Amino acid sequence: MKSVDLKILDARMRDYLPTYATPGSAGLDLRACIDKAITLEPGATTLVPTGLAIHVADPGYAAIILPRSGLGHKHGIVLGNLVGLIDSDYQGQLMVSTWNRGQTAFTLEPMERLAQLVIVPVQQVSFNVVDEFGASERGAGGFGSTGRS
């Protein structure tokens, strides 16, 4: 299994290091590394620091930042860019673009769990221009082509 070194930029994070909640967990919780609460009004966005820096280094891997399901479902708090992609050569602090798509103001407290970090494999592709594709059962069938008849 690949190990990725996470560097801590903020000493306050020492007591809040990300951990996997269960042996089957794919994501690590990212926290709001802020000094005081932030209130997000409906429709508002803000960048929230996590206090963590990452350098994946291996181009065969990347990190993605995903929303926490409870915050999105209960409070309308999601990522402003829906999914954050962290390339293997990025070396800075992880920031979470936070968007309140709900109808009421939401207050984000210091060190509150805000998003999840997942490390994923990456396969870079090369392109080959062709005149046509080989036959397949599906062909060019698009939206809904494998659903209801």
From Swiss-Prot:
Record-linked InterPro entries: dUTPase (IPR008181), dUTPase-like (IPR029054), dUTPase-like_sf (IPR036157), dUTPase_trimeric (IPR033704)
Residues the entry annotates as binding substrate: R68, S69, G70, N81, L85, I86, D87, M95
Cofactor: Mg(2+)
Any one GO MF annotation of this record: dUTP diphosphatase activity
Catalytic activity: dUTP + H2O = dUMP + diphosphate + H(+)
Record-stated family: Belongs to the dUTPase family.
Matching HAMAP family: dUTPase_bact
Protein name, per record: Deoxyuridine 5'-triphosphate nucleotidohydrolase
Taxonomic source organism: Bordetella avium (strain 197N)
Gene: dut
